[in-house]
């Protein structure tokens, strides 16, 4: 059986570029454990240029091949691609649209599901339509006096708020606000990251995460894991990835009643199926002191860095990551 030429595409144009490279390391190591794949790692930079790990400039053409700037190098045909890109253009659905156009099979959620989940406003509309509880919010489409007034009213009503750029990941463009004098500046900053902004009520709760993925034709939801931060610490980009971070994770959250855990998993599967996700996701919830469950967000290409929860939860559930990738890829190619 001939090997599969697999393009591992990483990087991208968002603030999560470097995190995507770390995740790609995990994918590359996992794929190397199988003899089925010829893997070519290509970095997409912030200017849309492609370069191999060896430093060769190249491009992905509509003939489903990698063509090198050095014309003495033969083109490399691509059978399958893993778009290991957090943020734009990976989780936004943009690059998936291009893969669809050139009929190149790819790993992960399709373009519409990616776009719907990445935009926090669209996602919350879907959560509500599916009957899944989520945090109270308002959304804003421009930075003006009315937006400032609405946000200040929300702060007065809720006591504490989060202001979030609607289309960013990893807590980029996300701010906790307790002081009305900071509202205008925070809104201005958030609108610098995205044309739409969402304002959410601050929820004092545990942060639980579920890995949801397809395995041998079934949608699997793991037991919830937990992100544990210092008291009153917001899980910022730096808290997630900085060496000085004091946050820690439990692959299986402790002291969660069985019925609550099962309800969280049921909501996670309902969101996965209802929003037509594919292959993998990480679905994040809040659990309040009163055991109220609130869906926070869906990540359609969860991180796979050394500290990331998705691969840990998958493995804790009894599944090998390399075998999981092989099953997905071979199943998809066989169905062509």
Swiss-Prot record:
Keywords for the protein's UniProt record, in alphabetical order: ATP-binding, Cell shape, Cell wall biogenesis/degradation, Cytoplasm, Ligase, Magnesium, Manganese, Metal-binding, Nucleotide-binding, Peptidoglycan synthesis
Record pathway: Cell wall biogenesis; peptidoglycan biosynthesis
Gene Ontology MF annotations: ATP binding; D-alanine-D-alanine ligase activity; metal ion binding
Cofactor binding description: Binds 2 magnesium or manganese ions per subunit.
A GO biological process held by the record: peptidoglycan biosynthetic process
Reaction(s) this enzyme catalyzes, per UniProt: 2 D-alanine + ATP = D-alanyl-D-alanine + ADP + phosphate + H(+)
Residues at which ATP binds: 154-209
Positions bound to Mg(2+) 1: 284, 297
Database matches in InterPro entries: ATP-grasp, ATP_grasp_subdomain_1, D-Ala_lig_Van_CS, D_ala_D_ala, Dala_Dala_lig_C, Dala_Dala_lig_N, PreATP-grasp_dom_sf
Pfam families (UniProt xref): Dala_Dala_lig_C (PF07478), Dala_Dala_lig_N (PF01820)
Binding-site residues, Mg(2+) 2: 297, 299
Domain of life: Bacteria
Cofactor(s) demanded: Mg(2+); Mn(2+)
Location of the protein in the cell: Cytoplasm
Enzyme Commission designation: 6.3.2.4
SUPFAM superfamilies xrefs: Glutathione synthetase ATP-binding domain-like, PreATP-grasp domain
Residues of the ATP-grasp domain: 124-330
One GO CC term, this protein: cytosol
Entry-linked HAMAP family: Dala_Dala_lig
Primary role: Cell wall formation.
Similarity comment text for this entry: Belongs to the D-alanine--D-alanine ligase family.
Cited PANTHER family: D-ALANINE--D-ALANINE LIGASE (PTHR23132), D-ALANINE--D-ALANINE LIGASE A (PTHR23132:SF25)
Protein name as catalogued: D-alanine--D-alanine ligase
Top-level taxonomy: Bacteria, Pseudomonadati, Pseudomonadota, Gammaproteobacteria, Alteromonadales
Gene designation per UniProt: ddl
């Amino acid at each position: 059986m001939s090997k599969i030429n697999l393009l591992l595409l990483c990087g991208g144009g968002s603030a999560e570029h470097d995190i995507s490279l770390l995740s790609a390391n995990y994918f590359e190591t996992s794929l190397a454990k199988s003899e089925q794949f010829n893997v070519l790692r290509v970095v997409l930079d912030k200017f849309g240029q492609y370069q191999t790990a060896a430093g060769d400039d190249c491009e992905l053409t509509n003939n489903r091949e990698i063509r090198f700037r050095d014309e003495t190098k033969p083109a490399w045909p691509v059978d399958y691609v893993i778009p290991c890109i957090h943020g734009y253009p990976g989780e936004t659905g943009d690059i998936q649209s291009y893969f669809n156009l050139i009929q190149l099979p790819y790993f992960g959620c399709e373009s519409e599901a990616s776009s719907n989940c990445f935009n926090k406003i669209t996602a919350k509309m879907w959560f509500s339509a599916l009957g899944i509880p989520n945090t109270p919010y308002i959304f804003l489409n421009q930075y003006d006096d009315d937006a400032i007034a609405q946000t200040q009213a929300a702060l007065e009503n809720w006591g504490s708020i989060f202001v979030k750029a609607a289309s960013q990941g990893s807590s980029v463009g996300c701010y906790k606000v307790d002081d009305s004098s900071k509202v205008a500046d925070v809104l201005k900053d958030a609108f610098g990251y995205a044309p739409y902004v969402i304002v959410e009520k601050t929820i004092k709760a545990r942060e639980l995460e579920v890995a949801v993925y397809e395995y041998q034709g079934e949608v699997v939801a793991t037991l919830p894991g937990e992100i544990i931060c210092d008291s009153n610490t917001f899980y910022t980009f730096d808290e997630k990835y900085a060496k000085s971070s004091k946050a820690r994770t439990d692959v299986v959250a402790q002291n969660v009643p069985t019925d609550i855990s099962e309800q969280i998993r049921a909501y996670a599967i309902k969101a996965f199926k209802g929003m037509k996700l594919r292959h993998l996701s990480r679905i994040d919830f809040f659990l309040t002191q009163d055991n109220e469950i609130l869906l926070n967000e869906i990540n359609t290409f969860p991180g796979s860095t050394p500290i990331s929860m998705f691969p840990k939860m998958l493995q804790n559930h009894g599944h090998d990551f390399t075998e999981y990738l092989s099953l997905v890829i071979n199943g998809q190619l066989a169905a062509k």
